[in-house]
């Protein structure tokens, strides 16, 4: 009893490692696309913990691919220049000047900060944008009217990502994309992550958000849906109970699973080590979406 009390913390750590073992075995060599955004990008401690999770995933055999946003930092930079941020249905109105600033902030600042942090933690990251290696080809998105240089992805060339993964690197992708017209397009990071996950036939697509996951009742924080098959997810969308920023995220997950991604996850990026908790524990912490009904495990 004395020894158990003395080594209590160490025993707990050992139990956690044992619980993770089947997941490490199951996902070894598999690709996981992570959309990194929200509070996890703004809080220094959360930022470090997310990158620690990513590096650990790589060391235990998974192939993480990060796709990041940066909306708040873009808005902050625009404000310093006296440029007002305008949005239509959550999409940033992007004129030529704004497009230049979006590219500068996403590719030149945020992307390199993420790469530096991963490298400092012992990983090997390479930062790229959708322009590099013709990764993300886009055209003007007119679904919400003409918002300027807002694009929709029409083609994904995963060759550069696969090359980086094969050589042991962690790809970090800014969703600034190119068009056949020679223009630069600002593409929604959730959408870009979903398209990349589909093209890679990823094991998992994980969206880090500022909510617990998908709620059955948005007014009831205890109504988290931990697992959904596609039929359930589509019915929930059609019911009108999903609103706000969760609509495009759930749509993105549904489409990804329909197009070959095995599991899509919407998790709370405000929780410490949320990626590890979702991937390597029996219960997980957010909402997991799959094509068919789930067994009793989190695999």
UniProtKB/Swiss-Prot annotation:
Subcellular location: Cytoplasm
Domain of life: Bacteria
Reactions listed under catalytic activity: N-acetyl-L-glutamate + ATP = N-acetyl-L-glutamyl 5-phosphate + ADP
GO-annotated molecular function: acetylglutamate kinase activity; ATP binding
Pathway noted in the entry: Amino-acid biosynthesis; L-arginine biosynthesis; N(2)-acetyl-L-ornithine from L-glutamate: step 2/4
InterPro entries noted in UniProt: AceGlu_kinase-like_sf, AcgluKinase_fam, ArgB, Asp/Glu/Uridylate_kinase, NAGK-C
Cellular component annotations (GO), alphabetically ordered: cytoplasm
CDD domains (alphabetical): AAK_NAGK-C
A GO biological process held by the record: arginine biosynthetic process via ornithine
EC numbers, comma separated: 2.7.2.8
Pfam family, one: AA_kinase
Residue positions binding substrate: 70-71, 92, 186
Keyword Lyase part of the UniProt annotation: no
Key words of the record: Amino-acid biosynthesis, Arginine biosynthesis, ATP-binding, Cytoplasm, Kinase, Nucleotide-binding, Transferase
Site (Transition state stabilizer): 35, 249
Family, similarity comment: Belongs to the acetylglutamate kinase family. ArgB subfamily.
HAMAP family, alphabetized: ArgB (MF_00082)
PANTHER family membership: N-ACETYLGLUTAMATE SYNTHASE, N-ACETYLGLUTAMATE SYNTHASE, MITOCHONDRIAL
Protein name according to UniProt: Acetylglutamate kinase
Species for this entry: Caldanaerobacter subterraneus subsp. tengcongensis (strain DSM 15242 / JCM 11007 / NBRC 100824 / MB4)
Gene transcribed to yield this protein: argB
């Amino acid at each position: 009893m004395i020894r158990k009390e003395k080594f209590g913390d160490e025993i707990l750590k050992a139990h956690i490692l044992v619980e993770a073992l089947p997941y490490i075995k199951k996902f070894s060599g598999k690709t996981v696309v992570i959309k990194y955004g929200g509070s996890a990008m703004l809080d220094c401690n959360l930022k470090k913990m997310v990158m620690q999770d990513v590096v650990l995933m790589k060391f235990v055999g998974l192939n993480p691919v990060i796709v990041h946003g940066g909306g708040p930092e873009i808005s902050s930079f625009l404000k310093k220049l006296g440029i007002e941020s305008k949005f239509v249905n959550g999409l940033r109105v992007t004129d030529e000047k704004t497009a230049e600033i979006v590219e500068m902030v996403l590719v030149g600042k945020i992307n390199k900060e993420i790469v530096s942090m991963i490298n400092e933690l012992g990983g090997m990251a390479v930062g790229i944008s959708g322009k590099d290696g013709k990764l993300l080809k886009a055209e003007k998105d007119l679904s919400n009217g003409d918002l300027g240089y807002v694009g929709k992805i029409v083609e994904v060339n995963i060759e550069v990502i696969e090359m980086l993964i094969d050589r042991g690197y962690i790809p970090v992708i800014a969703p600034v994309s190119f068009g056949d017209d020679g223009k630069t397009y600002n593409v929604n990071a959730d959408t870009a992550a979903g398209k990349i996950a589909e093209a890679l036939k990823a094991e998992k697509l994980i969206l880090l958000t500022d909510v617990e996951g998908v709620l059955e009742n948005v007014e009831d924080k205890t109504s988290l849906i931990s697992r959904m098959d596609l039929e359930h997810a589509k019915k929930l969308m059609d019911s009108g109970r999903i609103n706000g920023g969760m609509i495009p995220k759930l749509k993105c997950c549904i489409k990804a699973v329909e197009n070959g991604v095995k599991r899509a996850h919407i998790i709370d990026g405000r929780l410490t080590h949320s990626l590890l908790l979702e991937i390597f524990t029996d219960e997980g912490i957010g909402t997991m979406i799959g094509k068919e009904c789930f067994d009793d495990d989190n695999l």
